[in-house]
Structures are given as C-alpha cells and as structure tokens.
Amino acid sequence: MKIDVDYAIAQYAQGLFLMADDRHGLGWYSSDRHALIPLDDQFRYPKSLQRVLNQNRFQVKINQAFTAVCEGCAARPETWISQELIEVYHTFHVAGWAHSFETWHGDRLAGGILGIAIRGAFIGESMFYTIPEASKVAMVKLVQHLRQRSYQLFDAQLQNPHLKRFGAYEVEEKAYKKQLEKALNYRCHFTSEPDLYD
C-alpha cells in the first residue's frame, strides 16, 4: 500500500487508527472508547514485577529492531497487523513517526512495544514478548521514558485485562479527543531527533 505519510499522521492526530482485515485490506477506524495508560501516579504494576525490575534482567533499547518488533506483534493466531500494515509502519518509522521500544536479554530481542509518537501523544499500537515479563518491563520503562520527555498522553487504544493491571482506564471519544488535542500542543521528542509534526 502506498500511503501519504502526512495525511496518515493527520488522521492519527484526529484519533483515527489503521487496521487490517482479511476482506478489505487496510482501513481507518475510530473507537467510541479509548484505553489510556496513566502517566501520573495512577500508573501501577504488579508487585511481582518489581522483583524482575530489581534484577535488571532486561536491557532497554529504542528502534534497534523495528521490523522484528512489528513482526513479533503480528505473530499471533488472530492479528490485525498484516504484512501490508508492517510495510506502512516501516514507512512511518523511516519518516520518524513510528518507534519500537524494546527489551533485550543479552543479544536476544525479548519483547517490545510498537507505537506512533506525535508531539505530546504516544499511540501504542501493539506489544509482544518472547520471554515472560519482557513486555511488562517494556511497559514500565516506556512510561518512565514518556514521563521524562514530558508526554501528556499514552493511548493504548483498546482496554484489556493486561492493561488494567497497569492502571489503564477508558475514556469516551469526546473526552479522548480533548486530551489528544491538549497533548498535541506539547513539543516532545521520543528520541533525540526533532519531532516532525509542527
């Protein structure tokens, strides 16, 4: 799929997101409710995870294995991430929008989170792991990273029991768009590279 990156990022900035399905290829979707990961003191995680964090079992890297993270996120029996969508994410990545936040165990990619960063908003697209606890560690470290860089919004899109363990909560579309609009007023850089959305 050939995609206009500027148009696509503008769609994300309006609260839409891309998904693949078997019948129609890629399409733009919206949701009545969005799951948000809190970036304040409402963020939490299981006590058992603190032991893993204290052990420093995993190392964190950013954008070192972007394609592998996309493929890891897509490697499940039911997935909305097609090969076509992976190629689109790669286009976003080359343009500076899409990022992979990774956990490594030695020289092995253990897990990661795929997302799109637009100014003060981080839109989490998917996550995966190959070693237990790796994606949970990635979540904790990503929240720390977003806080350090003054991000205002972490959109995890769809609520699930796993996200609830981190304090994820749902907001309706109208409230979400207000928070998104506010976040887009902040100039945040996910990496040391300047944000392109001006």
Curated annotation (Swiss-Prot):
EC nos: 2.3.2.6
Keyword annotations from UniProtKB, A to Z: Acyltransferase, Cytoplasm, Transferase
Catalytic activity: N-terminal L-lysyl-[protein] + L-leucyl-tRNA(Leu) = N-terminal L-leucyl-L-lysyl-[protein] + tRNA(Leu) + H(+); N-terminal L-arginyl-[protein] + L-leucyl-tRNA(Leu) = N-terminal L-leucyl-L-arginyl-[protein] + tRNA(Leu) + H(+); L-phenylalanyl-tRNA(Phe) + an N-terminal L-alpha-aminoacyl-[protein] = an N-terminal L-phenylalanyl-L-alpha-aminoacyl-[protein] + tRNA(Phe)
Major localization listed first in the record, in broad terms: cytoplasm
Compartment(s) where it occurs, according to its Swiss-Prot or TrEMBL record: Cytoplasm
Transmembrane parts of this sequence: none
Principal EC category: transferase
Acyltransferase is among the record's keywords: yes
Protein's GO biological process: protein catabolic process
One cellular component (GO) term of this entry: cytoplasm
Gene Ontology MF term list: leucyl-tRNA--protein transferase activity
Family membership: Belongs to the L/F-transferase family.
Function: Functions in the N-end rule pathway of protein degradation where it conjugates Leu, Phe and, less efficiently, Met from aminoacyl-tRNAs to the N-termini of proteins containing an N-terminal arginine or lysine.
HAMAP family cross-referenced by the UniProt entry: Leu_Phe_trans
Protein name per UniProt: Leucyl/phenylalanyl-tRNA--protein transferase
Organism of origin: Synechocystis sp. (strain ATCC 27184 / PCC 6803 / Kazusa)
Species lineage: Bacteria, Bacillati, Cyanobacteriota, Cyanophyceae, Synechococcales
Gene name per UniProt: aat
